[in-house]
């Protein structure tokens, strides 16, 4: 349970997703062996009277839900709506993708846009996963985000999960929106390049 291994796991997960593979499931086959035990230990410690900030482990199964998709697929979804005037086909796709995205079901965005194998979006996708993952781990380690001791369903909307899983951590909800804002900034120039290329393609190659 350390920030360097966690950040590496987030990087590898994003890299696998870009290649069309389920990065969470693949890396989780190794890490879940540890993180499931760690959240159980956190729960045991909490029930014994340990304060949330003093729980033994930062890295728990759902820690990534506070960063990875809210900093990548949520910004992509927003930009899909924003670009729908220039690229009309994006609006119905974004509308379909919105309800599942609220519950961290991101396959419609990953394979529908697609983000997978997308040369314009692969760099910010990997970057946001990695940076916000490390940032969230650090904020949890210093106590801004409460350490999780309840293993809620993975599809719980991220702000709610961050708040409830640590027994009412306001920081756990706030960090979701911070990571979303970070993702919006990182994705912006890459999305504009993607939008320009798609408009040119739609216009038959004209600039």
Label the model's feature ranges.
Residues 11-24, 33-36, 100-103, 108:
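Transmembrane alpha-helix interface/packing and boundary motifs in multi-pass membrane proteins
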Residues 29-38, 69-76, 97-103, 144-165:
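Pore- and pathway-forming membrane helices of multi-pass small-molecule/ion transporters and channels
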Residues 38-121, 125, 129:
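Helix-loop-helix junctions within the multi-pass membrane cores of secondary transporters/permeases
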Residues 43-49, 110-207:
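Transmembrane alpha-helical segments and their short flanking loops
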Residues 7, 11, 19, 26-29, ...:
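Hydrophobic alpha-helical segments of membrane proteins
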Residues 1, 17-28, 190-205:
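Flexible hinge motifs at transmembrane-helix junctions and intramembrane kinks/re-entrant loops
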Residues 2-25, 51-72, 162-185:
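Hydrophobic alpha-helical transmembrane segments
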Residues 4, 31-38, 184, 188-195:
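Helix-loop-helix
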């Amino acid at each position: 349970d350390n920030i360097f291994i966690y950040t590496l796991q987030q990087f590898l997960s994003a890299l696998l997703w870009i290649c069309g593979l389920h990065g969470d499931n693949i890396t989780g086959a190794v890490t879940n062996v540890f993180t499931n035990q760690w959240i159980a230990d956190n729960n045991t410690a909490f029930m014994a009277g340990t304060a949330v900030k003093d729980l033994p482990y930062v890295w728990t199964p759902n820690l990534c839900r506070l960063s990875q998709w809210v900093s990548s697929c949520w910004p992509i979804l927003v930009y899909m709506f924003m670009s729908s005037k220039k690229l009309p086909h994006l609006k119905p796709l974004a509308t379909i993708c919105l309800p599942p995205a609220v519950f961290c079901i991101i396959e419609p965005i990953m394979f529908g846009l697609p983000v997978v194998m997308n040369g314009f979006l692969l760099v910010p996708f990997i970057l946001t996963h990695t940076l916000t993952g490390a940032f969230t781990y650090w904020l949890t380690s210093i106590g801004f985000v409460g350490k999780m001791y309840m293993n809620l369903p993975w599809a719980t909307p991220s702000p709610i999960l961050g708040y409830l899983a640590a027994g009412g951590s306001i920081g756990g909800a706030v960090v979701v929106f911070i990571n979303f804002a970070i993702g919006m900034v990182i994705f912006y120039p890459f999305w504009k390049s993607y939008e320009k290329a798609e408009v040119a393609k739609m216009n038959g190659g004209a600039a």
